[in-house]
Amino acid sequence: MSTAKFVVPKAVENVRIEKFCLKLLPNIKLSQFFKLLRLGKVLLNNTKAKLGQRVSSGDTIVFQFAIEPYLHNHSEVVDLTQVQDDLQVIFEDEQLIVVDKPAGVVCQPDAKHELFNLANSLLKHCGYNQYFKNSLSFIPRFAHRIDRNTCGLVIGAKTNQALQELEAVFRHNLLMKQYQGLVFGPFNFKGTQKAYWAKDAYQALVTVKAKPFPNAKPITTIFENSKYLTKLDLSLLTIRLVSGKTHQIRACLNLLNTQLVGDRKYQLLQFKNRNRDFKHQALHATNLSFAQLDKQKFPLLANYSQRQFKSQLVPWFASLIKGVSI
C-alpha cells in the first residue's frame, strides 16, 4: 500500500484538516478527499482523521493512498507586478487591516479574477511582489469575504496569530457585522429572524427556510430599522448579522418576500422589470464591531475589545436615497 507522511510546518496553527490537505494536494477534488476521510485513508497523529479536525505545527498526517496524481509544482509563483496597491484602508496596524471594498471587486482569486482581486491587492499593499501558489507558509489575508457586488468593510490579518484569533472570533460570532440595504416596496418586519440555511455548491445558491430541513444550519439575522421611501417605493434597511453565512441577507429577504435592489441571483418575479436597470445589488457593509474578548482565549485580539470600524465608502445607491438616513 502506498503511503506518504507529512509533518505540519511551524507556520500552521489551528487549521481545519481538509483546508490544509487541499492545499497540500491541490489537484484533489473535495468530494474525493471527503471519501478518503470516510474510508480511513487519512491519519492524524496515527488516528483516523475526521472532517473538521484542526491541525497545528508538529502534527503528523499520513496519507494511505498514492498522492502523486494530486500534486503539482509547489514552486509556482504568482507575479503581482501588475497588481496595484489600491486598497481603501480604514484602519491598519501591525496585526490587523480593515478596508473598504468597492462593488464589483472579488475578495479572493477565482478562475475569472486570478490576478486582480482584493486578496492580491492586500499582498501588494504589504510589500509582496510575488508569492508561491499553494504554499503552506503564512501570508497576509482577509478572514472573511463579502460578495463581489456588495461594497463595504472587510477585515484581514497581517500575522499568523492574528489570523488564527480572528477566525476564532468569527466562529464564535464575536464580531458584529452591520449592513445597509435597499429593497423593493415597503418592509414591515422588524426584529430577529431565526431561520435555517443550506448551500447548493453546484449552483452557487443558498436556501433559507423558516423551519429545519435536511443539512440545514440555524442562522440569525436582525432587521434593526427600516424607512419606506414613498416616492421611490423602496425601503432602506439596517441589518445586523449574528451568524454570517454565504448570501445570508439576500436569501433571508426572499423568505420575507422581498429582495435587494439590483440582486439578480435572488431576484423575485414581481420585481424583475424594476430590477433591470441596476448593475450591482444595493448592499453596503457599513460597520464592524468587536465584542468584549476574553484575554485568555484571545491574548492578541483582546486589545481590540469593543473596537468599532465604520465604512467611509459612499455606496452606489446613495444617489437614489440622497438625504435619507435611518
Curated annotation (Swiss-Prot):
Active-site annotation: D147
Domain of life: Bacteria
Acetylation among keywords: no
GO molecular function, one term: rRNA pseudouridine synthase activity
Any one GO BP annotation for this protein: enzyme-directed rRNA pseudouridine synthesis
Catalytic activity: a uridine in RNA = a pseudouridine in RNA
Keywords, in A-Z order: Isomerase, RNA-binding
EC id: 5.4.99.-
Domain S4 RNA-binding: 15-76
SUPFAM superfamilies the UniProt entry points to: Pseudouridine synthase
Annotated InterPro entries: PsdUridine_synth_cat_dom_sf (IPR020103), PsdUridine_synth_RluA-like_CS (IPR006224), PsdUridine_synth_RluC/D (IPR006225), PsdUridine_synth_RsuA/RluA (IPR006145), RluA_PseudoU_synthase (IPR050188), S4_RNA-bd (IPR002942), S4_RNA-bd_sf (IPR036986)
A Pfam family hit: PseudoU_synth_2
Signal peptide (UniProt feature, chain positions): none
Top-tier EC class: isomerase
Family as reported in the entry's similarity comment: Belongs to the pseudouridine synthase RluA family.
Listed name of the protein: Uncharacterized RNA pseudouridine synthase MG370 homolog
Source species of the chain: Mycoplasma pneumoniae (strain ATCC 29342 / M129 / Subtype 1)
